[in-house]
Regions:
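Soluble ligand-binding/transfer domains with enclosed cavities or grooves
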Residues: 1-147, 159
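A short acidic/glycine-rich loop-to-helix N-cap element
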Residues: 148-155
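Short, compact, well-ordered microdomains
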Residues: 155-162
Length: 165
């Protein structure tokens, strides 16, 4: 049983088949991504803006920690994802976000429950606003993520795309 199956338990079956497949399998998936990253996010390793760029997404699990690797253009983004009670935690570089997984109409979204920067907890007022949604359509897995700056509400990062099953 993989990470999201463990966290969601029986609720996992309510996900669209394409979303279930992505979170059940390890290995490499291919697809496309369109990305808009602010200069500050580019400093954190995100590539410059691109449209319909090739995307390779690889997953593996080591001792209950999922390793996610995304190859976008010439950049590789790596994150570690694990379970904390009924929440999912993802660390990418110096930022760690704890989220609740929510299922509606077969789609999966994440609601932020905590943010750490350089392992220090941030007060809620300083949390970035993250909207993350995954869904299936016509046999393909789709995703859309938007990260907005706290207080000033400016888009720091937005990306969306798809992966083949």
């Amino acid at each position: 049983m993989r990470l999201f199956e463990r966290i969601l338990g029986a609720r996992f079956e309510a996900l669209a088949p394409e979303v279930q497949a992505l979170h059940r399998q390890v290995g490499i998936k291919e697809g496309e991504i369109s990305l808009r990253a602010s200069p500050i996010m580019q400093l954190f390793g995100f590539p410059p803006p691109c449209k319909d760029a090739p995307l390779w997404f690889g997953t593996r699990e080591e001792e209950n920690v999922a390793i996610w690797r995304r190859q976008i253009k010439d950049r590789e983004l790596r994150s570690e994802v694990w379970q904390s009670g009924d929440l999912v935690v993802e660390r990418m570089g110096v930022v760690t976000i704890t989220s609740e997984l929510v299922i509606a109409h077969g789609a999966l979204s994440q609601e932020t429950r905590g943010v750490r920067f350089m392992d220090l907890p941030l007060p809620r007022a300083l949390w970035p606003r993250v909207t993350a949604r995954e869904w299936g359509a016509a046999g393909t897995y789709h995703f859309k993520i938007v990260v907005r700056a706290p207080i000033i509400d400016v888009v720091l990062l937005a990306y969306e795309g798809w992966l083949r099953p």
